[in-house]
Swiss-Prot record:
Subcellular location: Cytoplasm
Family membership noted in the UniProt record: Belongs to the methyltransferase superfamily. RNA methyltransferase RsmG family.
Organism: Pseudothermotoga lettingae (strain ATCC BAA-301 / DSM 14385 / NBRC 107922 / TMO)
Protein name: Ribosomal RNA small subunit methyltransferase G
MF (Gene Ontology): rRNA (guanine-N7-)-methyltransferase activity
EC number: 2.1.1.-
Length: 225
């Protein structure tokens, strides 16, 4: 039994062996990457932090997924290994995208596309086109919403992974939710075996985003919604 499967068993997560083997290979490649994708080098802790954190609160996904600021492929690549989705991973750092290209080839992952771009620079034809938009460790919630909501279909969902201080961000994001036509579906709280408290904030897009969003980076940062 590989290490991912062993740790999944501790959480009661049931996944096909072929998928846990692929995830196990991925985490080995991630923690040994020659570029700075994670500060973690302990495999077991990295599995809790970078794989279980993504998988545990999610039951099933289908359709087209956009992962904003994917870094080393978290959460988008992990979700693409597990679920029948077509994922687009967006990352602005070219060397990270090049590393991800190698990983997709090495692990024979065919349901993932890569875009080297910032979210606010994505072409207009990407707006209102994804069933699911995800992000982890990119920015505070009201900024995340502006970066991500424009690319989600009406009726689609947005998933944001956050730590124990999420409530302050959430309370500050109500104007962003209203402006961008986003409503809360569910807030899933969970604790990793490492003791870390986590939440998955789930939103639904209930109307089209005004055409002027997302704004330029400097405007978003200087005057968040």
């Amino acid at each position: 039994m590989n290490k991912v499967a062993e740790i999944f068993r501790e959480y009661g997560i049931k996944i096909d062996d072929s998928k846990t083997e692929k995830l196990d290979s991925y985490i080995d490649l991630l923690i040994s990457a020659p570029i700075n994708l994670t500060s973690l080098r302990d495999k077991e802790y990295a599995i809790h932090k970078h794989i279980v954190d993504i998988v545990f609160p999610v039951k099933m996904l289908t359709g087209k997924l956009l992962d904003v600021g994917t870094g080393g492929g978290i959460p988008g690549l992990i979700l693409a290994i597990l679920f029948p989705i077509n994922a687009t991973l967006v990352e602005s750092v070219r060397k990270k995208v090049m590393w991800l290209e190698k990983i997709l080839n090495m692990l024979n992952i065919g349901n993932v596309n890569l875009l080297c771009s910032r979210a606010e620079k994505l072409p207009a034809d990407k707006k209102e086109s994804f069933d699911i938009v995800t992000a982890r460790a990119v920015s505070e919630l009201r900024i995340l919403l502006e970066l991500c909501a424009p690319f989600c279909k009406v009726g689609g969902r947005l998933f944001f992974y956050k730590g124990p201080n999420w409530k302050q961000e959430y309370d500050a994001a109500h104007n962003a939710m209203k402006t961008l036509n986003v409503e809360t579906i569910e807030i899933v709280s969970y604790t990793l075996k490492t003791g870390e408290k986590r939440v998955l904030l789930q939103f639904q897009k209930v109307g089209r985003t005004p055409d002027n969003y997302p704004r330029e980076t400097k405007k978003i940062l200087k005057n968040p919604l």
